[in-house]
Amino acid sequence: MTENQQLTALVAACHWIGEKGWCPATGGNMSVRLDDAQCLITESGKDKGSLQTEDFLLVDIATNHVPSGRTPSAETGLHTLLYRREPTIGAVLHTHSVNATVLSRVEKGAELVLHGYEMQKSLAGQTTHLDRVVIPIFDNDQDIPALAQRVTEFASHTPLRYGFLVRGHGLYCWGATVKEARRHLEGLEFLFQCELQRRLLEAKA
């Protein structure tokens, strides 16, 4: 895809995310890789449901430098970290949905394990509900470099797949393309809602 096609796809994904209510109050951030050296990421403080192409900033993946001098998302470092570590990642979507935020707090451990759901097959490489889908959970931190370091340490021994949760904060998910990242986001949101409902019903039983 050309740069314009990639950006058009990402803008459409942002509008869809806004309609879903997954990034309220200008929260969240989205990006797309242009090549090995550069990505485009949302400018800070923009409503995701009404983004336009001019609301995305060019960022150097190696240094986080923004040639325009404008202010990118505060969490730019997590996007560029993912692009550096995983060359196959082509787009990153970070959302603040209720399901992701609450489930990341309800689950007290370091990971959320999903098992037995047909929708697991929405994730690349998943072929059966019998497998386990493991979503890491990292404690929230306003110090983004410190949070990025914890993600780096995790990734040094465990491959990053599909996404991770930041406790009380939201979901980071990705894909080889904007289209795949969007499918992963929709699939994970469905799975999170199912898991929350399951836990709620079991607690009442």
Curated annotation (Swiss-Prot):
Cofactor binding annotation: Binds 1 zinc ion per subunit.
- Look up the record and name the cofactor or cofactors this protein needs: Zn(2+)
Q: Give GO terms for biological process.
A: L-methionine salvage from methylthioadenosine; monosaccharide metabolic process
Question: Which GO MF terms does the UniProt record name?
Answer: methylthioribulose 1-phosphate dehydratase activity; zinc ion binding
Can you state which reaction this protein catalyses?
A: 5-(methylsulfanyl)-D-ribulose 1-phosphate = 5-methylsulfanyl-2,3-dioxopentyl phosphate + H2O
InterPro entries attached here? Answer: Aldolase_II/adducin_N, Aldolase_II/adducin_N_sf, MethylthioRu-1-P_deHdtase_MtnB
Residues that, per the record, bind Zn(2+): 94, 96
Going by the record, the broad EC class of this enzyme is lyase
Alphabetically sorted, this entry's keywords are: Amino-acid biosynthesis, Lyase, Metal-binding, Methionine biosynthesis, Zinc
User: Which pathway, per its entry?
Assistant: Amino-acid biosynthesis; L-methionine biosynthesis via salvage pathway; L-methionine from S-methyl-5-thio-alpha-D-ribose 1-phosphate: step 2/6
Q: Name one GO cellular component term.
A: cytoplasm
User: Which parts pass through the membrane?
Assistant: none
Documented EC number(s): 4.2.1.109
- Pfam families for the chain: Aldolase_II
Q: Which domain of life is it from?
A: Bacteria
Q: List the disulfide bonds.
A: none
- Coiled-coil blocks: none
Cited function: Catalyzes the dehydration of methylthioribulose-1-phosphate (MTRu-1-P) into 2,3-diketo-5-methylthiopentyl-1-phosphate (DK-MTP-1-P).
Q: To which protein family does this belong? A: Belongs to the aldolase class II family. MtnB subfamily.
**Protein's UniProt name:** Methylthioribulose-1-phosphate dehydratase
Organism whose genome encodes this protein: Pectobacterium atrosepticum (strain SCRI 1043 / ATCC BAA-672)
Q: Coding gene?
A: mtnB
